[in-house]
Amino acid sequence: MAERDLAVAILAAGKGTRMRSQLPKVLHKLGSLSLIERLLRTVLTLKPQRCLVIVGYEQEQVRRALQEYPVEFVEQAQQLGTGHAVQQLLPVLENFQGDLLVVNGDVPLLRAETLQALLERHRQVQPDVTLLSAQVADPYGYGRVFCDAQQRILELVEERDCTPAQRQNRRINSGVYCFHWPALARVLPRLGRNNAQQEYYLTEAVKLLDTAIALDAEDAREIVGINDRRQLAQAYQILQDRLKEAWMEAGVTFVDPDSVSLEETVELAPDVVIEPQTHLRGVCRIGPRTRLGPGSWIESSTIGSDCHILYSVVSHSQIGDRVWVGPYAHVRPHSQIGDGCRIGNFVEIKNAQIGSHTNAAHLAYLGDAKLGSQVNIGAGTIIANYDGQQKHFTEIGDRSKTGANSVLVAPLKIGSDVTIAAGSTIPARYPVPDDCLVIARAYPVVKPGWRPGSAAAGRPQPLPTGSLRVYPLRLLPGQDLKQELERFARQQPLQAGFVLSAVGSLSQATLRLADQTEDYLLSERLEILALSGSLCPDGVHLHLAVADAQGRTWGGHLRPGCLIYTTAEIVLADSLEYRFSRQPDPATGYLELHIEKVAEATPPSPQRADGTGVGIPSCPP
């Protein structure tokens, strides 16, 4: 068998009118690769000395798409047929003495084994041309090949030029030829355009050559050309069938092959089971006995052995052995999940490292995080990783647990053996040491008669404790102590209010003593020592004690004109068992406190953080 140099010419100048697209036909995708890329990767396995791509329509797009491949581009400015395309090679291959393999750019399913067989047959027999043909059930749309018993070509007829009798021939021309270039170069200038399309046919060159033979492809499916979207879809199905048949022979189960798709870059171990409606894209490696689907999307990810990915999306991530994912989980890019983990329904993981035997069984978001081993994530746990400007990182130690509906505000580091109580919000940068319980809750608030925009909206709200409602307040510099307390008592309204504690400072104080008609003013900075009395919507009756810089104390009825210097931190309480009002008292002549017993209240009775009794639960500062 004579060894000669090999050049390859790929015809890629046509528009592909029937594709109804602005994209050149050869750049349409078949799976992850364009038609011409698939073909080019196949022909390059033959190791040709030169690989020539003939371009025309939207040639800049084709040049850009193939810029990483070792090819030469030859322009066909006018698209006047396949023969005209090959004529453009005459100056390019002027001194070439080897063989030329000519392939249409829209035949992406050709296998390297078939082209190698064509090349070997051509070099063994040494005709001027060897044509790749095939026997098909439906030859419509293809040119026909007529041969004698020795496979010498007698006639080639294009579909549009066939007589009714010739159309009955089921042997078709694939458009793949192996020419001896010196012989082809002699006849190319003699091509004519005497046909229905007024084009230069390459088949005309075959007729002009002295010796021409045909070789049938073993699998007619691989010479399918792509002229429209229907044929593109059919070619995709052929590609999928080819891939799945190979994997089934290697020990992989496809429960419903027709509903599954995958790419050539996928690697499947023996005893993998692919359930219906599952799709694999990119570079994927799936370990033994793993079950994918039903209804899963796996992209560019590595999944270990004995896993189950159920109705879920896994993208650009790594999953260990014996991991359960789903249903309806989303493992986003740059995530690593350790052995024995469970990522359950409606759990989203992004850029996270999950230690072994960690569970997030349902309804959680774990983003930009590192979780240790044997961590348990309660339902509704959210890592709040974005502050509106940048993402922050969260770390959770081994064996820690989060209760239901917890929010972890990043950046945050939680130690090992930590329990986060249900409903807790852990603020950013809050130190959480090893081996502790953390409770950080907001307690229920009831606003009777509240509606959006009503007077009740926006008021400070109480923390329930026994039969009391507790209101912590802070007054700001310049505010009037009495006026602010009167306003607060009216707006709540306080039912039977009184002062629990008060600390702070005043820039001045106005007080009045009993039986006095005039106030006295202290115009200096003063510390609040005590504030006591009652509050209700009708008014307040409060006494104030203050001290000056020399330690002298002053006291009396609180009057308007007590102005806050730096702050006043006041805790008020409101009894749910009584109702206060201020009514005229004939004996004193003043508005005095009137006390009324109301129906016994039964508010919630929260326990202390240690669970030993009733009181205000302890929370982190």
Swiss-Prot record:
Entries under HAMAP family matching the protein: GlmU
Family assignment from sequence similarity: In the N-terminal section; belongs to the N-acetylglucosamine-1-phosphate uridyltransferase family. In the C-terminal section; belongs to the transferase hexapeptide repeat family.
Compartment(s) where it occurs, according to its Swiss-Prot or TrEMBL record: Cytoplasm
Disulfide bonds: none
The encoding gene: glmU
GO biological process, one term: cell morphogenesis
One cellular component term from this protein's GO annotations in UniProt: carboxysome
Pathway: Nucleotide-sugar biosynthesis; UDP-N-acetyl-alpha-D-glucosamine biosynthesis; N-acetyl-alpha-D-glucosamine 1-phosphate from alpha-D-glucosamine 6-phosphate (route II): step 2/2; Nucleotide-sugar biosynthesis; UDP-N-acetyl-alpha-D-glucosamine biosynthesis; UDP-N-acetyl-alpha-D-glucosamine from N-acetyl-alpha-D-glucosamine 1-phosphate: step 1/1; Bacterial outer membrane biogenesis; LPS lipid A biosynthesis
Enzyme class: transferase
UniProt: UDP-N-acetyl-alpha-D-glucosamine binding residues: 11-14, 25, 76, 81-82, 143, 158, 173, 227, 332, 350, 365, 376
Co-factor binding details: Binds 1 Mg(2+) ion per subunit.
Region (Disordered): 601-621
PANTHER family, per database record: BIFUNCTIONAL PROTEIN GLMU, NUCLEOTIDYL TRANSFERASE
GO-annotated molecular function: glucosamine-1-phosphate N-acetyltransferase activity; magnesium ion binding; structural constituent of carboxysome shell; UDP-N-acetylglucosamine diphosphorylase activity
Entry binding sites for Mg(2+): D106, N227
Protein name: Bifunctional protein GlmU
Subunit note: Homotrimer.
Coiled-coil region list: none
Region described as Linker: spans on this chain: 230-250
EC number(s) reported in the record: 2.7.7.23, 2.3.1.157
Gene3D superfamilies reported for this sequence: Hexapeptide repeat proteins, Hypothetical protein, similar to alpha- acetolactate decarboxylase, domain 2, Spore Coat Polysaccharide Biosynthesis Protein SpsA, Chain A
Pfam families associated with the record: Hexapep, NTP_transf_3, PCC
Subcellular location, principal: cytoplasm
Region (N-acetyltransferase): 251-621
Active site positions, chain numbering: H362 (proton acceptor)
Organism: Synechococcus sp. (strain JA-3-3Ab) (Cyanobacteria bacterium Yellowstone A-Prime)
